[in-house]
Amino acid sequence: VLNQRDELILREKYPFVGHTTRIPIALPDRGTSIQQTTELTRKKPTCLFLGSYFAPNNQGILWFVEHVLPYVDIHMKIVGRGMSKLKDESPALRDIEVVSDAPDLLPHLQDADIVVLPIFSGSGMKVKTCESLMYGKNIIGTPEAFEGYDIDYSLVGGNCKTAQDFIECIKNFTQNPRPRFNEYARKTYLQKYSLDAIKQSFKTIL
């Protein structure tokens, strides 16, 4: 299973299941392509939401735009397959930069000061969280976005349960700039969520 939550669900549905092992999500390393800049986050940070046109993503970003965006001074950017459709459907996104079906995500990740992940539903572990770690990004997300990840939220960015949490976390970045390249995030990916790391986990159970 990917995480403790999945294990509990599995045992609830199939009480006869014996021993289980948690093996988290892993991705091949593409993070070497990003520039490991020493620049600090900008006073008006670019906050990037990565996600395709999909109900949990749509719900999350629309919530963020309504409950967080009016109270912070940021440049908001939404990048994801089919997200132009959401912009057409949602007047709230009218003045927000939306890039749909981008051929390459790297320039958008490179430019972002912070990746925001306001995700409230789903299962397993979120791929975009792993990708953001891989590219060494500052990440501000919900408990659902971080479900199953073993990380220090204060070092990676912030774990936000409410709109006010998001607002305060973003304002902390604007008042106390951090490196745009988050070495802790990158290191966490390499040690725990890279293919090499997961291979070691499999070796321990075989």
What are these regions (language model features)?
Residues 143-159:
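Short acidic/histidine- and often glycine-rich active-site loop of Leloir-type glycosyltransferases
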Residues 12, 21-111:
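Conserved catalytic-core segment of nucleotide-activated headgroup transferases in glycan assembly
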Residues 125, 141-143, 161:
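Conserved acidic donor-binding loop of glycosyltransferase catalytic domains
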